[in-house]
């Protein structure tokens, strides 16, 4: 009987657990390392600055229809755009359903990954101050891209408080303050929307134009009815999508 190949998966978030499940389906020996205490990655809310978690009010921006696993649908009672608590519970249910927990080593940091002369991955990990080295036949990196904040450089001096969205957990810190949000990505828009509820004023700065897409069109999640447009030629798709957004949202300047 052949010994199954060993695969290391870094991260027990949505991608990591999906990778682990499918690798186990192929009868491979899988070990998942995650520095957190629970399945879910950044969907597990935490006030700890070192953990790049969602905000306290975060809901997913894609519908549950297009965000769920094909082999494990989200609960029928979930809303179209579930909260971070519901998402974390869903990922943990997925891990329990497919018996992934025995393969996950929590509170473990991957220190180094090296490919040796025998094409084996030498994985160095740290847990509770103990350094361990383990060899694997393959490596799947599923740690995401939100864990390390990147700061832009601006000339001059700013006398106020400068923060990265990575450091924002709760929005009471913006109470009665004037806030400038730089960027038009998901995190920037979330910070702008949530901070304006408590701030004296919130402005958002974009270096280029963005379409702000409504979550619902005709009472349906937008991403579930717009998919057919993707089959159109790009020029027609852009014009059609732009016309739809202008019809339902108007101009950004109106807001």
Task: Annotate the PLM regions.
Residues 3-4, 8-39, 44, 92, ...:
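Rossmann-like dinucleotide-binding core of oxidoreductases
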Residues 37-38, 73-74, 110-111, 128-130, ...:
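Conserved beta-strand elements of beta-rich interaction domains across eukaryotes
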Residues 45, 56-59, 103, 201-204:
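A short alpha-helix-loop-beta-strand transition element characteristic
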Residues 47-74, 223-236:
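N-terminal glycine-rich dinucleotide-binding loop that anchors FAD/FMN and/or NAD(P) in oxidoreductases
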Residues 58-61, 99, 153-157:
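Short, conserved catalytic or adaptor-binding loops enriched in Gly and charged residues
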Residues 68-89, 239-255:
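Conserved N-terminal/central alpha/beta ligand/cofactor-binding core
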Residues 79-147:
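Feature captures the FAD/FMN-dependent oxidoreductase FAD-binding
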